[in-house]
Regions:
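Active-site loop-to-helix "anion-binding N-cap" substructures in soluble metabolic enzymes
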Residues: 1-161
Length: 161
């Protein structure tokens, strides 16, 4: 659980009303609701979080949860990761669809596919996807280009890998 003390945090009457409504909904939904807050979120958001952490830890919390509704207060790639790791009957929501991450936005799928094709065409490396078993160990003398991605990447890049 989030262990930050927000008792001294002052709020406007409007923010106080929103906070009270969120608390009511959390009480009403109980264990069916999980709110995840990334470290960089402001106090008025993370004060409602069940867990506060980095993108990897929070995605693990989503994967381990049986909550029906998971609200991910973080960047879009974080909610995508949580959605990939949760079951089909769980709903992962991102409160602000514009919540981005400059690192996640550095490479688009089009850019990566173009770079991939250029690396394959300019080297002797092969694409492992064309092997009978792409996960098997390469035979002696074979060299393959192996894609790797970082947690802070969009779901379409993770799918490419």
């Amino acid at each position: 659980m989030c262990a930050v003390d927000f008792s001294s945090t002052s709020m406007s009457p409007e923010d106080q009303a929103i906070a009270e409504r969120i608390a009511e909904l959390k009480k009403e939904l109980g264990e069916d609701l999980l709110i995840l807050g990334h470290h960089y979120q402001r106090d008025s958001i993370v004060m409602h979080a069940d867990f506060l952490g980095d993108s990897f830890m929070l995605s693990q919390k989503a994967a381990d949860s049986e909550a029906k509704y998971i609200i991910f207060c973080g960047g879009h790639f974080m909610a995508e990761s949580a959605d990939i790791l949760t079951s089909p009957d769980q709903v992962v929501m991102l409160p602000n669809i514009r919540a981005g991450c400059s690192m996640a936005d550095m490479a688009t799928l089009v850019d990566v596919e173009q770079a991939w094709d250029e690396m394959l065409s300019s080297t002797d490396l092969k694409d492992p996807i064309h092997r009978d078993n792409p996960a098997s160990v390469a035979e002696e003398g074979e060299s393959y280009l192996v894609p790797v991605t970082y947690m802070n990447s969009s779901a379409d890049l993770k799918d490419f890998v």
